[in-house]
A protein has these predicted regions:
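Residues within mature, well-folded domains
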Residues: 24-189
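Bacterial N-terminal signal peptides that target proteins for export
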Residues: 2-13
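Residue-level signal for mature regions of secreted extracellular proteins and peptides
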Residues: 16-17
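C-terminal motif of bacterial Sec signal peptides marking the signal peptidase cleavage site
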Residues: 20-22
Length: 189
């Protein structure tokens, strides 16, 4: 009976250890909250949120999240941009200003919104349009198209041919259509 009680008392600690062990191997943060460094001041704590998170390597992301003060964050940012060159830094700054002007909404700067991230990374789309949403209660789906010959973005990758966005509350977010279920043939009984 005593062994059973000890096992029950240890269960929460073991569960916590298992969860921590499972998270330790994660290569990159999975959400906006994972990109915020709470040890830094307001000018630096969310520096990774937005397109920079797509430019940073997993090692750079981990290093930034381990910083302890704003001076270290400023030095980190300077080193980050010096590795990428002035052309990328300049293009990033110009596109971020434009994204802030065009896509700020819901209390977020434009370059930190889904449309803004794509705009900063790949520039303006070749074509913009709208599609009717499959859900009649939803707004129209905004569609951005990049040509097959679109140049690589600031992240070194070519853009996807199509990006879709839909209004959800105060924000316009990325929209990925659900796959239609396969129609199964009728079964004879």
């Amino acid at each position: 009976m005593v062994d059973r009680v000890k096992r029950i008392q240890c269960a929460p600690a073991l569960l916590l250890l298992a969860l921590l062990a499972g998270c330790g191997g994660a290569s990159a943060p999975r959400s906006m909250a994972d990109l915020i460094n709470p040890l830094l001041g307001p000018d630096w704590s969310a520096w990774l949120v937005g397109p920079i998170s797509r430019l940073a390597t997993p090692e750079e992301t981990r290093a930034f999240l381990a910083l302890k003060d704003d001076a270290a964050a400023a030095a980190f940012a300077e080193s980050f941009w010096s590795k990428r060159g002035n052309g990328i830094r300049h293009a990033y700054a110009e596109r971020a200003v434009t994204a802030d002007r065009l896509y700020s909404e819901g209390g977020y700067l434009g370059h930190r919104t889904d449309r803004g991230v794509i705009y900063v990374l790949y520039g303006p789309p070749e074509k913009e349009g709208f599609e009717v949403s499959p859900n009649p209660r939803d707004s129209a789906i905004e569609v951005w198209s990049y040509g097959k010959d679109a140049p690589s973005g600031l992240d070194g990758n070519r853009p996807n041919p199509v990006y879709r966005f839909i209004k959800r509350g105060d924000l316009t977010v990325s929209y990925v259509p659900r796959a239609q279920p396969l129609a199964l043939p009728p079964v004879d009984h």
